[in-house]
Amino acid sequence: MIQPQSYLNVADNSGARRLMCIRVLGSSNRKYANIGDMIIAVVKEAVPNMPLKKSEVVRAVIVRTCKGIKRNNGMILRFDDNAAVVVNQEGNPRGTRVFGPVARELRDFNFTKIVSLAPEVL
């Protein structure tokens, strides 16, 4: 579960290294975000000489959470870190590569481009 003030790793090569969630998109009083949800975040740590700079406000899709998600077959999928992929207004990733595994549920939320770039889909 990701809430405002939560820090996330960035799972792509957009230039950001760490993000801090400042808003969970959805209904007006939504408190938590999970895998496949869109958030508004601020770049807290960035790679030098890349398009994204520190203190830039971006949109991101959550691809991994420590809390995990429960599937219909009873399996619970948990990851080692909280991670997100920086996206543009249309939901397409800003980077050209995605690092680490992502959940299969992203395909259900129409983030097929992120799923196709990922090296491993669990």
Swiss-Prot record:
Keywords: Chloroplast, Plastid, Ribonucleoprotein, Ribosomal protein, RNA-binding, rRNA-binding. It comes from the Eukaryota. The lineage of its organism: Eukaryota, Viridiplantae, Streptophyta, Zygnematophyceae, Zygnematophycidae. It is found in: Plastid, Chloroplast. This is Large ribosomal subunit protein uL14c. CDD domains: Ribosomal_uL14 (cd00337). GO terms for molecular function: large ribosomal subunit rRNA binding; structural constituent of ribosome. GO terms for cellular component: chloroplast; cytosolic large ribosomal subunit. The gene is rpl14. Part of the 50S ribosomal subunit. Binds to 23S rRNA. It comes from Staurastrum punctulatum (Green alga). GO terms for biological process: translation. SUPFAM superfamilies: Ribosomal protein L14. Its main location: plastid. Belongs to the universal ribosomal protein uL14 family.
